[in-house]
Amino acid sequence: TESAVKLPSSSERDYIGTPRAEGFVKRYLSEDGAPAFGFVGLLPVDKNEDIFDFARSLDGGEWMDMWNKKSGAVRVKLPEFGFDYKVELKDVLAVLGVTDMFDPGKADLGGIADCAMSCSRMIHQTHIEVDRNGTRAAAATAAVFDSAAMSSDKVLVFDRPFMFMIVDYATGIPLFIGVVTNI
């Protein structure tokens, strides 16, 4: 099935263009007027490249090279979208070797509690919403403890799967990363 999607447009100052990807940065300013955060949209140059393969293959060095070479203005048409994501972290942390805190016999959480306790669950949840009014993003992690007791000639149209990021504008370090597949 096909559906009509509104693609609000905007002029942005930071165009990203490399042999592998094209994109933009939408700046979000702090109270003093300096860029504090940026929303990044990236499209693989190869229209047939799977967006998940593209996102997986983009390493830190390549990303920082893109970030450091951003230049010029671009006109952007980006769909409005929103996502919620929730994950139980116990198994994820176990893969990373973090297991003792979940074992009542091994947990040593004396730095945060006066009694013997262990963590029974850890949940991470994120939310992002992008629309014509801007970007809203939030993330929270909860643990359950148990005690023994501008204008341009360039135009980018995001009308196919793409990758997005929220980045610290001063460093370019990604704070949120995701992909949009249903356009």
Segments from the language model and where they lie:
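Mature hydrolase/peptidase catalytic cores and their serpin-fold inhibitory cores, especially
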Residues: 1-183
